[in-house]
Amino acid sequence: SVTPKLAFHLLSVVKFEDYLRLQQSLVADLAAGGDCIKVLICEHTMELTVGRKGSHAHIRIPQTEREKQNLQTHWLPRGGGAILHSPGQLAVYPLVPLQWYGWSPGRVLTMVRDAVSMALSQVGIATLCYDGLHSVWGRTGMLAATGISVQQNVSCFGSYINVSPAMGLFGYVDTAWQLPADQSRRTMSSLMAEN
């Protein structure tokens, strides 16, 4: 077993299209033989992303409101559904050269979810994780959504942790496309609401 090498990069608020260009460049570097897991941490401007499990039906923000907010929508080849991004939500992107470490995409997905859950417990937030699901739930609802993809044998994308975003539009985006048995509603929440 190889001991992972990690490099953390703290970015600021980044437009999603700018992040995608950066991710593409880093994936190419890692695919060319890199052995270091690069973890990018940032916030995004208010934008929507939709993964492979998402659809137009998961976005119920009226078109007039989307235009008023200048809300861009990006259809992505990552797992998961629709996610609303905004400042106050922490995006954590572990770019892992899978072949170097011998990890499967499923293992990385579970590791990311578990790392988020452990980090939140370290700051006093009780979390719930469910077998077969990769979101992190708290007392008040879903706290973090996770979705990855693999490009050139490197994991991309990651987890989105709601720390203190303005929650107004979150109710119009169905991020929780699959609900755990003991969660009765598709509620996105935040770490601030947990306190």
Task: Map each language-model feature to its residues.
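A hydrophobic, small-residue-rich beta->alpha segment in the mid-to-C-terminal subdomain
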Residues: 168-195
